[in-house]
Amino acid sequence: MIAGPAALFADGQAESDNCVLPSHHAGVSFPLDQVEKAWACRLQPIISHYTTATKIGSERTPLPQDIFLYLLDHPVMAAALVNRLDFGLYKAEQRGPQDFWATDGEGTEGTIHPLYQEGSTRMYFAQGSHDGRLLPRVTGKAVVLLQLHPVTDGRGIESIDSTLVAYLRLDNRLLSGLLSLLRPLIESVVHRQLLKAFDAARLLGGAMREHPEKVLFEATDPPALPDEEVAFLKAALMSLHNPTLSPGPTP
């Protein structure tokens, strides 16, 4: 968990007049200059006046980059597999051509808009709510920055190391007076929720490598996943057990 002044996360202060966003966050570079100006002006107050700022990683997922990216860019499919394999209570639904809604099934839900999806970098805007046992219901907006790095271990197993930086700004004015007291608790909740998502991804990757038949069964058990996703999954599972094969390009 990262704490302290905003300077620790951003090299230079974003200029509110033209909504220029810094490119360095917690020691990692992100191409925020590629974000459309209208979006940049929505992100600027979240990054400059965050409630919490969190860095996680690197976290390893035992999947090659092409398979990992496909699942990352198909969150409805990924959430369904995690749920059916009992790795979590995640659910996701497409909301329009780009946005999707997601819940962890334990009080956190929201809509997510992809801002940038190129190469090994993903950047998102999220807005949602958390209703848990330790906190009153809170709503807020977040900027989520994700950097991926493919690695191969000594056994030749391809994996992805992920580093995530997230800025959260709460909407609830009633909490502003208590923020100094609640901040450690809020930071703990955010950190736990993000780690839980990485754990689910790691478990899914492990199942795809070690129990491909079970993964495919869950994907095709009625109601089956869409045909194109099942086709990719079949090819991906085959490639994991025969590295000379490739699951094909990521649509």
What residues fall within each predicted segment?
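Coil-to-beta-strand transition motifs
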Residues: 51-52, 121, 155-159
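Hydrophobic ligand-binding cavity/cleft-lining segments
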Residues: 10-96
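Extracytoplasmic/periplasmic, Sec-exported soluble proteins
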Residues: 56-64, 70-73, 134-136, 182-189, ...
